[in-house]
Amino acid sequence: EFAELEQLLYFLVDEIKEEDEIIVVVDETNVHRNVTELLYHIGKSEENINFNWYEHPLNKDFSKQKNFLNSKCSGDFIFQIDADETPLSNLIDLLPQILSGNPHIEAYWVPRINTVEGITEEHIQKWGWMVNENGWVNFPDWQMRIYKNNRDIKWEKPVHEKLEGFKQFSHFPPSEEWCLYHHKEIKRQEKQNKFYNTI
């Protein structure tokens, strides 16, 4: 995921507002040297942004990892993005206006475009996926990723995590400009599915 993480971080560095912060949490039991070097480089070279990163053991529990991330955030809202995902500029640009214009909303469902390079009909049948004419898997694949920074709002379940503790929620439109992009190669998808089955 190094290439995806690098792409995401430099995208965020270019896009975020002065009052925003970038927080990265990496699995301390599986830290790659190139990832560490990337994080040090961004932290040193981008002194005008609020950038911090932490190592924390995953221990086959994605909710604990995400709740640890939450504990390090200081903003009013959290936009939780996985290393292999990238939002579009439109979403980042309009997000402050949307959040301030809807003060009663505590959490937002974000649509996600999944593409899997090397996918076959056998994979689609095996996993029960739906693939549309654009090659997008299970679109809009709603993800609860934008939520108020509130200690009562937290993640539950070790895998296929679920956000709990909010009352009012909304959905972004299921159109491309509001999406997270999520691209994988089939070998990594198979490896990830096997790992999820062990949790």
PLM region spans:
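Short, acidic/glycine-rich phosphate-metal binding loop used to engage nucleotide
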Residues: E55-F62
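Solvent-exposed polar/charged
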Residues: D14, S71-K72
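Conserved acidic residues
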Residues: D20, F51, D76, D84, ...
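Acidic donor-binding segment of Leloir-type glycosyltransferases
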Residues: L9-E55
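Flexible loop residues that form catalytic
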Residues: D27, A83, I113
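Catalytic-site signature of metal-activated, phosphate-bearing donor transferases
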Residues: F62-N70, F77, T86-I199
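A structural helix-start
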Residues: E1-L9
